[in-house]
């Protein structure tokens, strides 16, 4: 990211600062000039590595923030659209309880084209990246590392004779962040202006079960004294 600047220049500046500091306390009777230069070089390298780690953390945090904002707005819009022909008291908790894959399936049923699109694949990958960033090891990490190894460019885990990525190896570049952002923009543009209940196919079985579950929760809540 731009605020991290030129890392080579940053390293040289750090070396210069270190040498200026050591020069003030240099004792020619005891100190080795070459050792000071070696220490300055190591100081520059260590500083650059700390910047790289910070940059990676910032990129992951920004990716997570962008995704959560998108996810929230998408669920809110889905509820608004469905409330035109469904009971809002039923669909609101149901939509918020859906995982991201289920939400996309619901939108596909409504009429959006998501599967087998570049932006759909990026959105699904982004969701997995954020889950791994938040929760570490788990199903999301295993799925992401097997289907999208590009987010684990430097695997460090050892399993037998193989090197496998760990959840700590997760990495997002600036280019990949832009791809996620572009996918979100493309998705919003792909949403049709109108969705009509009469054009929907039969409700899939998984959706019927979720609706019934939400109805049951609503009835149970209404019967409480």
Question: Residue ranges of each PLM-predicted region?
Answer:
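Extended intrinsically disordered or low-complexity regions, especially N/C-terminal cytosolic tails and loops
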Residues: 1-60, 117-121, 152-225
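Flexible secondary-structure boundary motifs
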Residues: 64, 68-174, 178, 182
């Amino acid at each position: 990211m731009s605020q991290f600047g030129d890392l080579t220049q940053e390293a040289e500046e750090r070396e210069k600062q270190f040498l200026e500091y050591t020069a003030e306390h240099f004792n020619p009777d005891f100190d080795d000039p070459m050792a000071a230069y070696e220490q300055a070089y190591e100081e520059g390298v260590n500083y650059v590595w700390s910047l790289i780690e910070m940059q990676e953390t910032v990129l992951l945090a920004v990716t997570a923030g962008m995704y959560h904002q998108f996810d929230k707005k998408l669920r809110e819009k889905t509820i608004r659209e469905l409330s035109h022909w469904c009971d809002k008291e039923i669909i609101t908790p149901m939509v918020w309880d859906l995982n991201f894959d289920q939400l996309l399936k619901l939108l596909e049923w409504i009429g959006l084209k998501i599967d087998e699109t570049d932006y759909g694949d990026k959105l699904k990958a982004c969701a997995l990246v954020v889950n791994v960033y938040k929760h570490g090891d788990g199903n999301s990490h295993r799925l992401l590392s097997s289907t999208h190894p590009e987010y684990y460019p430097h695997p460090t885990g050892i399993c037998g004779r193989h090197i496998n990525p760990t959840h700590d190896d997760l990495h997002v570049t600036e280019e990949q962040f832009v791809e996620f952002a572009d996918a979100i923009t493309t998705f919003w543009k792909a949403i049709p202006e109108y969705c009509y209940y009469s054009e929907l196919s039969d409700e899939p079985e998984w959706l019927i079960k979720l609706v019934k579950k939400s109805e049951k929760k609503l009835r149970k809540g209404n019967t409480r004294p």
